[in-house]
């Protein structure tokens, strides 16, 4: 593997701007690595090699001539295939959108273009982001780079696998119930989901609108904070996006005293779930490392954690059924040629183009929103969601961050299932609209990486990056170790 690919993004930016490294060298190294590893991993659905090399040459010319450059000029990135880039296909890994061309840029893409980033390709995902393994993509299954017989997690598994294997220095994903942070844990990298409303979702294909957020994959916490600084900007086109000053999350991320001043909450409910033995052991080691550095740990009690899987299924599926209702095959997307009338055409367009997991969620969502079930299912779920939010808010009176394993299981082989409780502490962040970040902490005896998760209070993202960065420094995890593919 080319050593240039092990360079952290901040250092890449400085070396490109100073002329020590050319952007075209980095982009060529990325595509060389992709050609060597992606036939096994299958992280990318589409590559833009010719255009990327042309853009890299243009970036180098800008720097050489002293022209105005973006702050991330010439740095390559992977983009999950549910985020629009004007003039490019966006499939959401579904047959329904296989010929769809994005008519405009997503808000995050606009900001990255201003920063001078180079989009090397589209990463694989579960179809319409519905799944936790990247197996429901209609095009290919993505493998975990550390063992290609195992899943990388999902739904943003392609982005996670691409960063983990060194194909790109960072990537964008989306997170509805852990879809960035779970695969980050499985693949041994950093995965960050922002506070609800911090990053605009304009131009991202909606799954469940009260959960969805766009976030970041990277090898280090500092790289994640750097990218977030460019995309976390107020946007009136997303009605829940906060408007405010742009924040440099990378500035001041190094806080040598933070562990001596914070209280870390450990959920009492952890003991209620059967986590993999090694996860329990290594999580305990991580807690002890925090204590040794001066962090205070307190037990917090959030009884409503037990409702998280059911809450997520009911509310998420209800929102899925509403969002997918706009996919009629008439205005855009797959259109059946077998319809006898308009209603039949709607039905057949979906039946012929949507996968099993998507259909299952639409059906369940339609059921819980039905007149007979709305109050006892959907309405009750929203009430319990409020209960969960209130209990977590109360927990933050005793602590500054909630700390847990990223997942309660290690990755499974293709075709095997994760338990419904596996992502419970990740999904809670989506239900409550809170920021969360997964940081790798160790390798297990099987050679697979394991991650831990910090969850902060609403809009505590800057401090969340600080605590995650502090843990990264004491974890002992070798960020320069890459899978041998």
From Swiss-Prot:
Pfam families named among the record's database cross-references: Amidase
GO cellular component, one term: glutamyl-tRNA(Gln) amidotransferase complex
Keywords: ATP-binding, Ligase, Nucleotide-binding, Protein biosynthesis
Catalysis: reaction(s): L-glutamyl-tRNA(Gln) + L-glutamine + ATP + H2O = L-glutaminyl-tRNA(Gln) + L-glutamate + ADP + phosphate + H(+)
InterPro entries: Amidase (IPR000120), Amidase_CS (IPR020556), Amidase_dom (IPR023631), AS_sf (IPR036928), GatA (IPR004412)
EC number: 6.3.5.7
Subunit structure comment from the entry: Heterotrimer of A, B and C subunits.
Function according to Swiss-Prot or TrEMBL: Allows the formation of correctly charged Gln-tRNA(Gln) through the transamidation of misacylated Glu-tRNA(Gln) in organisms which lack glutaminyl-tRNA synthetase. The reaction takes place in the presence of glutamine and ATP through an activated gamma-phospho-Glu-tRNA(Gln).
Stated name of the protein: Glutamyl-tRNA(Gln) amidotransferase subunit A
């Amino acid at each position: 593997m080319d050593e240039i690919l092990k360079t952290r993004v901040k250092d890449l930016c400085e070396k490109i701007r100073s002329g020590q490294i050319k952007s075209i060298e980095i982009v060529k190294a990325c595509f060389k690595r992709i050609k060597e590893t992606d036939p096994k991993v299958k992280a990318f659905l589409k590559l833009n090699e010719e255009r990327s090399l042309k853009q890299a040459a243009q970036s180098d010319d800008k720097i050489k001539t002293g022209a105005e450059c973006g702050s991330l000029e010439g740095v390559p990135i992977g983009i999950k295939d549910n985020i629009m880039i004007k003039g490019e296909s966006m499939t959401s890994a579904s047959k329904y959108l296989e010929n769809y061309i994005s008519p405009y840029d997503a808000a995050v893409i606009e900001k990255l273009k201003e920063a001078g980033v180079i989009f090397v390709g589209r990463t694989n995902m579960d179809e319409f982001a519905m799944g936790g393994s990247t197996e429901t993509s209609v095009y290919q299954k993505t493998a975990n780079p550390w063992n290609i017989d195992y899943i990388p997690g999902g739904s943003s598994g392609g982005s996670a696998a691409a960063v983990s294997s060194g194909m790109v220095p960072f990537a964008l994903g989306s997170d509805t119930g852990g879809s960035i942070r779970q695969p980050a844990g499985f693949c041994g990298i950093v995965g960050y989901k922002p506070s609800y409303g911090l990053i605009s979702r304009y131009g991202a294909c909606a799954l469940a609108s009260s959960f969805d957020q766009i976030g970041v994959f990277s090898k280090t916490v500092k790289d994640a904070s750097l990218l977030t600084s460019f995309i976390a900007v107020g946007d009136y086109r997303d009605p829940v996006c906060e408007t405010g000053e742009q924040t440099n999350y990378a500035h001041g991320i190094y806080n040598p005293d933070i562990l001596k001043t914070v209280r870390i909450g450990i959920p009492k409910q952890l003991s209620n779930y059967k986590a993999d033995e090694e996860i329990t052991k290594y999580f305990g080691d991580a807690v002890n490392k925090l204590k040794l550095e001066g962090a205070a740990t307190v037990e917090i009690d959030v009884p409503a954690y037990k409702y998280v899987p059911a809450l997520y299924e009911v509310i998420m599926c209800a929102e899925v059924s509403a969002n997918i209702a706009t996919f009629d095959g008439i205005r855009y997307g797959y259109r059946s040629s077998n319809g006898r009338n308009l209603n039949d055409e709607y039905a057949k367009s979906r039946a012929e183009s949507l996968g099993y997991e998507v259909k299952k969620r639409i059906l369940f969502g339609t059921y819980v929103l039905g007149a007979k079930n709305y109050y006892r299912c959907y309405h009750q779920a929203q009430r319990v969601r409020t209960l969960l939010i209130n209990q977590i808010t109360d927990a933050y009176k005793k602590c500054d961050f909630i700390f847990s394993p990223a997942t309660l299981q290690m990755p499974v082989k293709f075709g095997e299932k994760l338990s419904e409780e596996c992502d419970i502490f990740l999904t809670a962040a989506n239900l409550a609209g809170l920021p969360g970040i997964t940081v790798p902490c160790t390798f297990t005896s099987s050679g697979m990486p394991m991650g831990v998760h910090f969850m902060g209070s609403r809009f505590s993202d800057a401090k969340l990056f600080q605590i995650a960065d502090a843990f990264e420094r004491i974890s002992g995890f070798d960020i320069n170790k890459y899978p041998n593919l």
